[in-house]
């Protein structure tokens, strides 16, 4: 096992906040594997690179010799996490949650070592709690403290409803740490309230409180908003190798090092070496190719990574995107048909040409042929190809933000 200092440096890499660092140092000094917990509510079947920030950190803990607990919130998934939400989320059925959970497991084991990963379901202990147990759990926190959360506070002050079951979510997540006797819990920055709840409940139940490590929310391909499927600025880990490759090669230069730090398994020493190469005149696109190949290999295998540049779809005669791929912003007030976007982006002479290209299969979005039914989402960024020679990395921005 690495020294405490070496472990701490890797643990803190890319992290937003570590609470409490001195406590974690003491835990590490004992020289025993720590129980590292991260919970995931399977509320959608497909993961994107934003989800993998936490999973990558779990892998780093795993490589340091610690016990990883990949907690699937099949019980909490039926409540719905209210974090950052302005309205009550519709609950999922147990069948939906379990179906999604199986899909999650097949995806996360492309990152985690399944032989060294403990998979847990929080229904295992939550289903056994009696009404009296739930009342005891609920008595550990007050409504006033719950309303300190920004999302609850905003909804309360704007007279929007907050269902009682939503107050239970952070309590249940906190109780998961009690049930698992977690030493460390990971979560996104939007989960800090829930993670701290785990510390408080562990104290209340006579356990040593866990340390918490918050990880940043990964920016999407637009470099501004968090990665989200609904915003169209995501890279899905099950996307075809060529599509994944083309999206990653076309990220803004300003986003490149952020992605390396949070998504790459290269050491910081190696990443700093790549930065030095870039400062010495290396083409940033060549550096992004290294990142793209690493991630394609992780999720699709080495052979797929070696061929990804030729299967990217957005290719010229040598199977490559142009080095000078233009960055194009198109202002809009709402989602827009692809024909209008191509016209406004200047990738076609007029709307009629756009319609003709769409009808003949001459338009590709992120490597995939699309037809006139494709809708460009407001805030989304895509690599667009119209015909054989017109390329652009197009972002549909709000007219308000473009003023």
UniProtKB/Swiss-Prot annotation:
InterPro entries: aa-tRNA-synth_I_CS, aa-tRNA-synth_Ic, Rossmann-like_a/b/a_fold, S4_RNA-bd, S4_RNA-bd_sf, Tyr-tRNA-ligase, Tyr-tRNA-ligase_bac-type, Tyr-tRNA-ligase_bac_2. A motif ('HIGH' region) lies at residues 42-51. Gene3D superfamilies: HUPs, RNA-binding S4 domain, Tyrosyl-Transfer RNA Synthetase. It is found in: Cytoplasm. Its EC number is 6.1.1.1. Its main location: cytoplasm. It is an enzyme of class 6 (ligase). A motif ('KMSKS' region) lies at residues 226-230. One of its GO terms (cellular component) is cytosol. Keywords: Aminoacyl-tRNA synthetase, ATP-binding, Cytoplasm, Ligase, Nucleotide-binding, Protein biosynthesis, RNA-binding. One of its GO terms (molecular function) is RNA binding. Belongs to the class-I aminoacyl-tRNA synthetase family. TyrS type 2 subfamily. Catalyzes the attachment of tyrosine to tRNA(Tyr) in a two-step reaction: tyrosine is first activated by ATP to form Tyr-AMP and then transferred to the acceptor end of tRNA(Tyr). This is Tyrosine--tRNA ligase. It comes from Pseudomonas savastanoi pv. phaseolicola (strain 1448A / Race 6). The gene is tyrS.
């Amino acid at each position: 096992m690495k020294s405490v200092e070496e472990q701490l440096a890797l643990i803190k890499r890319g992290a937003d906040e570590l609470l409490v660092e001195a406590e974690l140092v003491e835990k590490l000094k004992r020289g025993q594997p720590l129980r590292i917990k991260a919970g995931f509510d399977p509320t959608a079947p497909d993961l994107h690179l934003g989800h993998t920030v936490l999973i990558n950190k779990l892998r780093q803990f795993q490589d340091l010799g610690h016990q990883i607990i990949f907690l699937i919130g099949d019980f909490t998934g039926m409540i719905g996490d209210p974090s950052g939400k302005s309205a009550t989320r519709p609950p999922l059925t147990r069948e939906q949650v379990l179906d999604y959970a199986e899909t999650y497991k097949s995806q996360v084991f492309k990152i985690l070592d399944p032989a060294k990963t403990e998979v847990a379901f929080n229904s295992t202990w939550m289903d056994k709690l009696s009404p009296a147990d739930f009342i005891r759990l609920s008595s550990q926190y007050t409504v006033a403290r719950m309303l300190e959360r920004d999302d609850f506070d905003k909804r309360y002050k704007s007279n929007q409803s907050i269902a009682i079951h939503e107050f239970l979510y952070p309590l249940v997540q906190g109780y998961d740490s009690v049930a698992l006797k977690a030493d460390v819990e990971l979560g996104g920055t939007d989960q800090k309230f829930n993670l701290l709840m785990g510390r408080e409940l562990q104290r209340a139940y006579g356990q040593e409180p866990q340390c918490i490590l918050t990880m940043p929310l990964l920016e999407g391909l637009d470099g501004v908003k968090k990665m989200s499927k609904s915003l169209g600025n995501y890279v899905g880990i099950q996307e075809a190798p060529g599509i994944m490759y083309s999206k990653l090669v076309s990220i803004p230069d300003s986003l490149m090092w952020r992605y390396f730090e949070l998504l790459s398994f290269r050491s910081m020493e190696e990443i700093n070496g790549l930065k030095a190469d870039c400062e010495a005149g290396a083409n940033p696109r060549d550096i992004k190719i290294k990142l793209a190949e690493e991630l394609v290999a992780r999720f699709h295998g080495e052979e797929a990574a070696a061929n990804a540049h030729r299967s990217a779809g957005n290719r010229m005669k040598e199977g490559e995107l142009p080095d000078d791929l233009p960055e194009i912003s198109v202002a809009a007030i709402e989602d827009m048909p692809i024909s209008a976007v191509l016209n406004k982006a200047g990738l076609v002479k007029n709307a009629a040409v756009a319609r003709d290209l769409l009808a003949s299969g001459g338009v590709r979005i992120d490597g995939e042929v699309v037809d006139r039914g494709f809708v460009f989402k407001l805030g989304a960024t895509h690599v667009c190809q119209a015909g054989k020679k017109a390329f652009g990395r197009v972002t549909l921005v709000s007219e308000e933000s473009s003023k």
